[in-house]
């Protein structure tokens, strides 16, 4: 197992228990050194994906075993990153998006997708419908909820619009991604139809397929 930064191996092997801490430290350093100009930070934590191993300082701190320990640390690390945005006076001018990529792992203690059927690798909603939290103080009202049909492919055109970026001017003749701008929906704008009125298609790991409309 190797841990890379750009094209350089920085740890071999690496300690899987400390990855969330390492990623957060790197992210905070990036924010601190990039604060003078607009920046984009993509932070794909590996936790709580398998293999689930708790940080030594977080071991046995939850009431839900090692999975709970890992999630509690993840919550803490995200809080550290949000605190950094506040300390650097970037909180009001930074869009934060947090989401999962799929439903829970089957056949594990924490494998619950209630009230939906299906889990990871399934085309049912328990495998494909995931939480997504968006924070942008002053533009997105805190505490609002939406059940609108949104896909991860909608993030690029939505965030580009929010940042005043015309994707067509940057595509150099190539087709713009199929995603849609759902910014009005995220802002809770009434009277504006939700942009995604078409369908989404998924295929499950067992060959099962589904269309969501």
Regions found by a protein language model. Name each.
Residues 14-22, 65-75, 149-150, 176:
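Soluble non-cytosolic domains of exported or imported proteins
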Residues 27, 38-44, 71, 78, ...:
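Beta-strand elements within well-structured catalytic alpha/beta cores of enzymes
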Residues 35-41, 90-96, 129-130, 194-197, ...:
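Loop/turn elements at helix/coil->beta-strand transitions in domains of secreted/extracellular proteins
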Residues 1-38, 45-56:
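Formylglycine-dependent
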Residues 104-123, 140-148, 153-213:
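C-terminal cap/loop subdomain of S1 sulfatases and analogous C-terminal strand-loop tails that border
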Residues 41-51, 98-104, 178, 201-206:
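Short, solvent-exposed turn/loop segments enriched in Gly/Ser/Thr/Pro and often Arg
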Residues 3-8, 133-142:
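The feature captures the short pre-catalytic strand/loop hairpin that immediately precedes
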Residues 51-54, 60-70, 83-139, 151:
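Histidine-centered active-site microenvironments of extracellular/periplasmic hydrolases
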């Amino acid at each position: 197992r190797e841990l890379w930064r750009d094209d350089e191996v920085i740890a071999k092997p690496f300690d899987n228990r400390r990855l969330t801490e390492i990623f957060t430290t790197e992210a905070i350093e990036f924010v601190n050194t990039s604060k003078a100009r607009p920046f984009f930070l993509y932070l794909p934590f590996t936790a709580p994906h398998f293999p689930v191993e708790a940080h030594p300082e977080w071991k046995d701190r939850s009431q839900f075993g090692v999975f709970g320990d890992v999630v509690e640390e993840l919550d803490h690390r995200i809080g550290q990153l949000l605190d950094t945005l506040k300390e650097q006076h970037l909180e009001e001018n930074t869009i934060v998006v947090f989401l999962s990529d799929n439903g829970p792992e089957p056949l594990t203690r924490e494998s619950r997708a209630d009230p939906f059927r299906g889990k990871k690798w399934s085309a049912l909603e328990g495998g494909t419908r995931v939480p997504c939290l968006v924070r942008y103080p002053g533009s997105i009202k805190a505490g609002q909820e939406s059940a609108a049909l949104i896909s991860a492919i909608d993030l690029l055109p939505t965030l580009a619009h929010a940042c005043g970026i015309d994707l067509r001017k940057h595509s150099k003749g190539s087709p713009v991604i199929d995603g849609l701008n759902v910014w009005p929906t995220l802002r809770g704008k009434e009277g504006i139809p939700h942009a995604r009125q078409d369908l989404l298609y998924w295929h499950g790991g067992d060959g099962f397929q589904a269309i969501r409309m």
